[in-house]
Regions:
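Membrane-interface junctions at transmembrane-helix termini in multi-pass inner-membrane proteins
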Residues: 1, 18, 195-229, 240, ...
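Hydrophobic alpha-helical transmembrane segments
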Residues: 1-45, 229-233, 247-268
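Transmembrane alpha-helical segments of multi-pass transport proteins
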Residues: 4, 8, 12, 230-233, ...
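Alpha-helical transmembrane segments of multi-pass membrane transport and lipid-handling proteins
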Residues: 7, 116-117, 139-203, 235-239, ...
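Helix-terminus/linker motif at the lipid-water interface of multi-pass membrane proteins
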Residues: 12, 16-17, 74-112, 127-130, ...
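Interhelical loop/hinge segments that connect adjacent transmembrane helices in multipass membrane
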Residues: 13-25, 39-80, 127, 132-137, ...
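Alpha-helical transmembrane segments of polytopic membrane transporters and translocases
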Residues: 68, 84-85, 99-117, 147-151, ...
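Helix-loop junctions and terminal segments of transmembrane helices
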Residues: 110-146, 211-216
């Protein structure tokens, strides 16, 4: 999809002014079809043939075992992506679209960073599962993955916080018939929301560590309860914050929900696996964050 969209945007064959959401939909559909064809080719190359048969008892068993995972994904999707919808539904019509757009501009960077953390969790799942199955010690793997995730996400978050205004100006230009005052106000609001969402980014990235650990251990009941609590907190705070703070209220809600679910999952994993990260680990993380903030601040002011 990246290659197709890049070709459409920068090849010079197609005018950029003609690019619209339909082109993106067509590009995404084409990329899925190409991926499917490649996947089928690889399977056929290794198996020689592909026969499709339906074994209904087996299918029902798979569905039954998959339901807790499906419910978890559904609940997490609710409290991760409800904000733009609620902004449009809760705020008056004359400002809802504008505020949803302001939130979406900052959310795109949050979502991009979130994909990096998600890929990290995909790698960790089989590692955690293998260690748990063998009955080996998890302390080292959890500590290393947790430290690596915190280091990576803190760097991204702090850089985005300090340079939020610059990033918004780089990504979004002034629109036709828009005054410079309106543009600056829109960019400032989006940059302030980005700062808050970067706190959510760190929290959700930590969730990918301990949520993945609990998933590998089969603790789906606890994870679904945590996700359900997250949905309740999300809805409650959004209905309180959005009417008062508008798009910024949605970002504040996201921060609260992600931090709450992150903390709960951490303590559940700590209790189940008897995790002991040690005071030296937390001191090293805190020292790194202080050094990173100081360095970024000096670079920003120079």
């Amino acid at each position: 999809m990246i290659l197709i969209c890049s070709f459409l945007l920068w090849s010079g064959i197609f005018p950029k002014s003609d690019f619209n959401i339909y082109w993106f939909v067509y590009s995404q559909t084409a990329s899925y079809v190409i991926t499917l064809i490649i996947a089928i080719y690889i399977v056929l190359k290794h198996t020689g043939k592909l026969t499709i048969k339906f074994n209904f008892p087996f299918v029902l068993m798979i569905i039954k075992k998959s339901l807790p995972y499906a419910l978890l994904v559904l609940l997490m999707s609710f409290y991760n992506r409800l904000e733009p919808v609620l902004i449009e539904r809760i705020l008056p019509k004359d400002i809802s679209a504008v505020q949803a757009g302001i939130y979406a501009r900052a959310y795109r960077l949050f979502d991009a960073g979130n994909n990096i953390s998600y890929l990290f969790s995909v790698i960790l799942l089989p590692l955690f599962a293998a260690v748990i199955k063998k009955g080996e010690d998890l302390q080292t793997l959890v500590k290393q993955s947790f430290g690596l995730m915190l280091t990576m996400t803190c760097i991204i978050a702090i850089v985005c916080i300090f340079y939020s205004q610059n990033l918004m100006e780089l990504l979004y230009t002034i629109q036709d018939n828009e005054s410079i005052e309106t543009y600056n106000l829109r960019i400032t609001e989006s940059s302030n929301i980005l700062k808050i969402l970067m706190g959510s980014f760190v929290s959700i990235s930590v969730t990918y560590i301990f949520g993945t650990l609990l998933t590998a251990n089969g603790n789906l009941k606890q994870l679904n309860i945590v996700a359900a609590v997250g949905v309740v907190i999300n809805l409650t705070l959004n209905f309180i914050f959005i009417p008062v703070f508008e798009a910024k209220g949605a970002a504040m809600t996201s921060l609260c929900v992600q931090f709450a679910t992150c903390a709960i999952q951490f303590f559940i994993a700590k209790r189940i696996f008897n995790l002991k990260l040690g005071i030296s680990f937390w001191i090293s993380i805190l020292s790194f964050i202080i050094l990173l903030v100081t360095t970024t601040s000096l670079l920003k002011s120079s």
